[in-house]
Amino acid sequence: DTASEIGTNIIVVVNDNEMSIAENHGGLYKNLKLLRESNGQAELNFFKAMGFDYMYVEEGNDVSKLVEAFKKVKDIDHPIVVHIHSEKGHGYKPAVDNKENWHWSMPFNIEDGSLKNLSGGENISLMLGDWLLDEMKRDEKLVAIAAGVPRCYGYDKEKREQAGKQFIDVGIAEEEAVALASGMAKRGAHPVFSDFATFFQRTYDQLCQDLAVNGNPAVFNVLGASIYGMNDFTHICFFDIPMISHIPNLHYLAPTSYEELIAMEKWAINQDKYSIAIRVPEGPVVHSCEEYDTDYSDLNKFKMAHRGEKIAIIAVGNFFYKGEAVRLALANDGIDATLINPRYLSGVDEVMLERSEEHTSELQSRL
């Protein structure tokens, strides 16, 4: 609202297509709905309350109407909001019919909207979402939190309805999601907030101040965190380790497989001592028959998958199997390398590393 006090001809354009990514949540959207229904004439006007002049444009997909509106305001001598009512996906029937799915898309066939080059493989985020949905039936304190992208859990409208009050979408407000999770954990709930790694940058203050300072036992699933994840200019998913792992009292775990992920989830959700972030494996889903620990409260204790000599390979998360491939390649050359699954990104197992130094002359780290 500072802009309303500047006194210049700042023009704020609000593109109101009645959607967030999924459905909207929050009081602001109720006022937008009231303004749409009254053709911008409702006395209750959020923007005017902040000191802005206001203009409403109903036909937001009509270029001529938009040009007409902008001509009227381009030389105005005070701040104004131009509230434009548009349709998300306008002009392409598949996108209009399923607005949430078409917020973004992989390459598709323009004729019918079907996706090209479908891999048909498993999706670990969807699998995690289904597991959480099943857990909700056993744990009434468990609440899944999303920040405008419920489909990161695979939660379409039907699954959101199944979860009921055990699912909360705060809208595109990641800071609120972390603060909410922290407060819920403080009062004994089992909140789990899942989002893509690139969006956790928005939560840094809340992770440090609302969560970690208080040590509240909330759980945060960091999705797409890898060079395999989103990596364009505005959605970069591989800076999560330096950002999250150094925050005191926030413990960052890195499972290597789906089964290890679920083992860590079960522990993290049911313990009440630590703030936990989990780096969900990215790329093709890996399954393992290994028996994983059920208690991870012995913090920063690495796991030695294979003891060898001369070389130690530390392979983190979904790079563990690359480390295993390197170990096998070295074995073919007669070198028996040690392979370590660190499991924790926020600390170092000094005892294991010191023991490894006794048996190795080289330490190779793979992240």
Where are the predicted features?
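Acidic, Ser/Thr-rich peripheral helices and adjacent loops at domain boundaries
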Residues: G27-Q41, N101-P107, I241-P242
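Long hydrophobic segments that form regular secondary structure
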Residues: Y56, D62-D77, K273, R307-N341
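Aromatic-enriched
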Residues: P284-K303
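Single conserved hydrophobic/aromatic residue that forms the stacking wall/gate
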Residues: E358-L367
